[in-house]
Amino acid sequence: MHEAASGKAYPEVPFRIDHGRVAAFREVFDQAEGVPTTYVTAAEFTVIPDIVTDPELGIDFSRVLHGSQEYEYRRPLREGEDLTIKSRIESIRSMGANAFLVLVTELVEPGGDVVCTARSTLIERAPDRSG
């Protein structure tokens, strides 16, 4: 993973809080109403393919582990609303032979207000040197 990619922002992507997807999340979490707090993960998975295939980042996804996940809500998500996903690499740091990437994904209203911020830590393990 290339530490020089730290700070890189990715193209904005439109994202609808889709009733069908929300219903599936509610079913899994046995939630009767509202948008589950972890629904933001669906937004992250919309942009993750572009990030892990970015040659400028140079990540080897076969060695990636999910390290942590945080959500910060300014208000609840609403079914049917159209938001924009803004993603950026907040930081990349090495610890020993491993690399830690912090990805920040924001869901933003048309007026520019941030509704929710997700922060994910991905860990790229060192290459296996046994073989």
Regions found by a protein language model. Give the residues of each.
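HotDog/MaoC-like acyl-thioester-processing domains
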Residues: 1, 76-131
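Hot-dog-fold acyl-thioester-processing enzymes
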Residues: 1-68
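Residue-level signal for functionally critical sites in structured catalytic/ligand-binding pockets
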Residues: 18-24, 66-72, 94-97, 120-124
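Mid-chain, well-packed structural core segment of small domains
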Residues: 60-86
